[in-house]
Amino acid sequence: MKDKKIYKIIFIQLGEIYEIFAKQIFQSDMYGFLEVEEFIFTNDDQLVVDPSSEKLKTEFNKVKRSYIPIGAIQRIDEVIESGEAKIKKTS
């Protein structure tokens, strides 16, 4: 059985650093974009909830696929397990 890959994608949007997790990433047919599908978010059963994580869940709630400009991407890692998606201010 082939293991499912999980990717951590870090990119900049509107002066903020987004850190999201997804199961699928592809080079898009649209020149200069990366396709991201099957977003992964942590469970809601935590006692302390990060507001930026909740903002991301709301922002990507009904999104099937997102196209991120290649120039906005800072880093892509293949990780063993997903973490909490978050938004940070750029310094």
What feature does the model see in each segment?
Residues 1-91:
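Eukaryotic intrinsically disordered, low-complexity regulatory linkers and tails enriched in Ser/Thr/Pro
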